[in-house]
């Protein structure tokens, strides 16, 4: 057995107090996101862990890139027929997690997910590089394949067929929006007495703010 107990550090970079937070979580998310962007040196600051409940009843988590966020929710794109897409179709309750170690911060978002309008998916797909567009068409995401060579051959054939043509979004690929119902902000603090502030959406769409024990 490898002992990992010596991996530890003290978190001392910031604090999270009720006296300096906004009334809604999206405003605070925007503030933290801009701060991690400005911090520099962090690749793909929009990387998040998306956790869903699979058809087998087990949770599954994977890293996905956040592409937009608004006061309505958080948007990412994927293959609707993938394992992730099938899980979402069966159970729309999912969780998003962000961890920005350099700032000693974590955000956990729980909510319900639904597909965005097709024209929005079309617009984002059009903005992607051609290679990414073709990759979305070629890959039957999450399906078992015999070899990587099969994918590369399919991609080459599709590239040849699409020369000089518009590459349209496949109908089984598009965006989801996660409508938050609960958002927790975690700020590392000394002696493991971390700050945890939770925003919880009430039945009348009012955000209740609570402090949680670390």
Curated annotation (Swiss-Prot):
Cofactor: FMN
Gene3D superfamilies reported for this sequence: Electron Transport, Fmn-binding Protein, Chain A (2.30.110.10)
Annotated residues for binding of substrate: 8-11, 67, 124, 128, 132, 192-194
EC numbers, comma separated: 1.4.3.5
Pathway: Cofactor metabolism; pyridoxal 5'-phosphate salvage; pyridoxal 5'-phosphate from pyridoxamine 5'-phosphate: step 1/1; Cofactor metabolism; pyridoxal 5'-phosphate salvage; pyridoxal 5'-phosphate from pyridoxine 5'-phosphate: step 1/1
Binding, FMN: 62-67, 77-78, 84, 106, 141-142, 186, 196
Cofactor note: Binds 1 FMN per subunit.
Keywords: Flavoprotein, FMN, Oxidoreductase, Pyridoxine biosynthesis
Catalytic activity line of the entry: pyridoxamine 5'-phosphate + O2 + H2O = pyridoxal 5'-phosphate + H2O2 + NH4(+); pyridoxine 5'-phosphate + O2 = pyridoxal 5'-phosphate + H2O2
GO annotation terms (biological process): pyridoxine biosynthetic process
Single GO MF annotation: pyridoxamine phosphate oxidase activity
Domain of life: Bacteria
General function of this protein: Catalyzes the oxidation of either pyridoxine 5'-phosphate (PNP) or pyridoxamine 5'-phosphate (PMP) into pyridoxal 5'-phosphate (PLP).
Subunit and partners: Homodimer.
Family of this protein: Belongs to the pyridoxamine 5'-phosphate oxidase family.
UniProt-recorded name of the protein: Pyridoxine/pyridoxamine 5'-phosphate oxidase
Species of the source: Flavobacterium psychrophilum (strain ATCC 49511 / DSM 21280 / CIP 103535 / JIP02/86)
